């Protein structure tokens, strides 16, 4: 009886919506302007990072993250996850360059939690952990990254550089 009551409430609520209420588009449709804004912030962040202007890079990556997280809920979660992990990993690198090691670790850890088996995320996490002198955890992060990308020698070099 309770289930029917709840169902009736939902049906009555839906009936109150105007007939022209828009349906969300399919999840493979992305808002072009938003995608362009995200790409622009990433490009500006990357350009600033290459110039070693890390504070500006952080600002642009942060703006990009804000745009990504403002995407409508009906857009594809896999696209959002891909965009977000790259932007978090990039901001982690910029934070690390500014010696904001805890913030760098937070971003790298979030990227790894979102994407899982992703070498770049594990590499950034390992670098941040090493900067915090948490060497065993750094070694574990580098080893996980190396499992994701067995041909990438950077992981072995990073492990060898640990005390």
Over which residues does each language-model region extend?
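Alpha-helical tetratricopeptide repeat
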Residues: 1-163
């Amino acid at each position: 009886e309770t289930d029917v009551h709840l169902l009736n409430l939902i049906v009555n609520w839906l009936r109150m919506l105007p007939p022209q209420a828009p349906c969300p588009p399919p999840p493979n449709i992305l808002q072009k302007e938003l995608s362009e804004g995200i790409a622009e912030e990433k490009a500006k962040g990357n350009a600033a990072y290459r110039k070693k202007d890390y504070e500006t890079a952080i600002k642009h990556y942060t703006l990009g993250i804000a745009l990504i997280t403002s995407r409508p809920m009906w857009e594809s979660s896999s696209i959002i996850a891909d965009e977000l992990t790259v932007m978090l990993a990039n901001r982690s690198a910029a934070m690390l360059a500014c010696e904001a090691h805890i913030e760098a670790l937070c971003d790298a850890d979030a990227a790894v939690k979102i994407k899982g088996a992703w070498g770049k995320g594990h590499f950034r996490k390992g670098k941040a952990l090493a900067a915090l002198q948490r060497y065993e955890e750094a070694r574990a992060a580098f080893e996980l990254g190396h499992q994701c990308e067995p041909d990438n020698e950077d992981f072995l070099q990073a492990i060898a550089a640990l005390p």
